[in-house]
Amino acid sequence: MKAVDEKLANYQFEYTGTSDDDLLIGLESGKYDIGTKGAWYTDERAKKFVIPSEPVGASIIGFTVRKEDEQKYKTIDDFAKNKGKLVPISPQNAQWNVITSYNEKHQDAPIELTAAESFKVADAYAWVLEGRYDAFFDIKLSFEKAVTAEDGPYHQYADKLSWFPYKGIPTYPLIHRDEKGEKFAKEYEKAIKELKEDGTLAKLSQQYFKEDVFSYVDKD
């Protein structure tokens, strides 16, 4: 967003660090004008906030599996065809929609979706390790911070768990829904398109994530 800020001479950004809950409440109330939290597009969010047409980033989503199964499950198609059991997902979670979309396109070999309320990530990893489920639908950055990193809270599982990618999910800034927000969204879209076309977004992605996260996003 700082690169967007530099493009928009008519706007002066003031940055505030906060929790996800406060960000969402603040955006609805008008306390904040714009917020970024790696938010995916959902119809529910689009009713509450202005969501620009152009993403600011992407989350790489994939599957955490047991290391012993990393040759068996190399792609989402492998997982589906081998009838792998997926850790339950809340229907309110945007990840539910990703699997639902996959199943609609692969009705001959869908992934079984089980609805569940929220649970601790530690439980999901433990369930996979003990064989209760075969995979946890997990964001790459979350897996790296939680398991791969030496100071990660679940690093003790690093030699027992593996992760493979499925696709990139575009992430968007959320903007307070009012006339001012609608106007800003149009200015943002113009700026972000320029940053995309001149290669700035890809360079920033390489700088912070060591890869171009946009390359994982479907082009259709």
Question: Where are the model-predicted features located?
Answer:
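Short helix-initiation/N-cap motifs at beta->coil->alpha
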Residues: 13-25, 111-126, 130
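Periplasmic-binding protein-like
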Residues: 57-62, 94-98, 151-189, 191-209, 211-220
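A ligand-binding cleft/hinge motif common to bilobed small-molecule-binding domains
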Residues: 22, 28, 36-47, 97-101, ...
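Flexible hinge/capping segments at coil-to-helix
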Residues: 66-87
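Hydrophobic residues within well-ordered alpha-helices
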Residues: 4, 27-28, 63, 79, ...
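Extracytoplasmic small-molecule ligand-binding "clamshell" domains
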Residues: 1-39, 198
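Ligand-binding cleft/hinge of the Venus flytrap
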Residues: 1-11, 92-118, 125, 147-154
